[in-house]
Amino acid sequence: MKKFLSKKPVKVIIGIICVWAAVVIVCNAVFASIALELQKGVAVCDEWSAADTYTPDYAQSVEAGDEDFKILCLTDIHIRNHATFGASWLGTNFILDTMSRIKLKQLINEAQPDLIIVGGDSVLTAWNDICTQQFADFMDGFEIPWAPVFGNHDYEGRADKAKLAEIYENAEYSLFKCGPEGMNGMGNYIVNITRNGKPVYSLFLMDDGQFRIVDGKVTDGGVNENMIEWYKWAVDGIAETTGNPVPNMAFMHVPVPEYKEVNGEYESGHRGEDSYTAVENEGFFQVFKENNGTHLFAGHDHLNNFISEYDGVKLCYMTKSSYNCNFDFNTLGGTLLTLDKNNNVNTEILEF
C-alpha cells in the first residue's frame, strides 16, 4: 500500500476527490428530487384594523427585572446555500454550515444573551422547510428566547412562507408570531422588554424582505404603508396602556433607503459594500423618528456591520453570522445590545 501511494499519490488523490464528488452529487440529486414536492403551510395571520383597540397581551414580552438585559443579533446565516455550484453540488456548504454552527454555539455561550434576534436569510435552499426546522431546533437548544424575521431568501424553496411561519411559531423558545394580515410578508410582531411587568422598550420585528414589482422590475419590498400604519397604531397603544411613551427599536432584513446616506462616520463596524435597499421609500424612517424610535437594525448586506447615527436615529447593521454565502472575515459574528439598568442601549460587535 505504501509503495502504491508513493508511486501514484496524485492519481490516488484525484480518485478520492472524484469518488467524493460523485457521492455528493448523487446525494444532492436525491434530495433535490424530494424537494420538488411543494410544502404549503397553514399558518394564519391575524385580522387587524387600525380601528382595533390595542391591549397589552397583543405583544410578546420578556422580563428584564432589575439587571442589564442583553440582546444578541445574528443574521444572514444562509444554511445550505444553494446559490453557487460549489456550495450546492460539491458539498462545501455542509462544511461551511458545520463551521458556522461551531462558531455560533461558541458565540452564544460566551455572550450569554437574554434574547436572540435573527435578522433573516437563515436558510437558502430548495428544501427550506427541512433546514428551517433544523435551525429552529438548533436555536431552541440554547433555551433562550429568540425572535426571527424573514429575509428575501428564506422562502425561495419548496416550502412557502406560511410553512416556515408554522415552524417558527411551533418552536419552543421562539417568540415568532405570524402577525397581522395585509402586511408585506409574514412575521410582523412585537416583543416588549419589561421591568416588573411594565414595558420599558418595544422591539418591532418586521418582514420587509418580500419581493415586489416596481416599474416592471422585481425589487426588495421594504416597509409598506400598511406596516407603517400598524407600527404607529402599536406605538400609540403601548404608550396608552403603559401610561407613558415607550422607546422602541425595529429589526428587519432589508435596510431602509436612509442607510445609503451614511458614509464614513461610524461609531463601530465598517461599510464593505453599498446598501441595497427597497427602490421605493414609503417614509418609515421619518415615522420611526417621530414615534420614539431609537435604533433601526438590518441585515441583507453581508459586508456591512456599521453602527452610525443619522438624523437622530441609530442606523445599525446586524453582523453576518456564518461562513456560508458572500462574507468577509472582518464582518463575521454578531451584534450585542445591552440595555442597562437605566434603559440606555449600548452596542458591541462580537467577532467570530
Q: How should each PLM-predicted stretch be described?
A:
Residues C27-S61, I190-N196, F284-V287, N291, ...:
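Binuclear metal-dependent phosphoesterase catalytic core
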Residues A111-D114, S202-L205, K217-N305:
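His/acidic metal-ligating clusters that form di-metal
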Residues R80-A83, L124-W127, P148-D160, F211-V214, ...:
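Active-site environment of divalent metal-dependent phosphoester hydrolases
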Residues Q39-E63, Q133-G243, T335-T338:
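Extended active-site neighborhood of metal-dependent phosphoesterases/phosphodiesterases
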Residues D76, L104, I116, D121, ...:
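Divalent metal-coordination and catalytic microenvironments
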Residues M1-V24:
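N-terminal Sec-pathway targeting helices
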Residues A32-Q134:
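N-terminal active-site segment of His-dependent metallophosphoesterases
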Residues F69-T84, V200-Q210, F251, V313-K320:
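Active-site-proximal beta-strand elements of phosphoester/diester hydrolases
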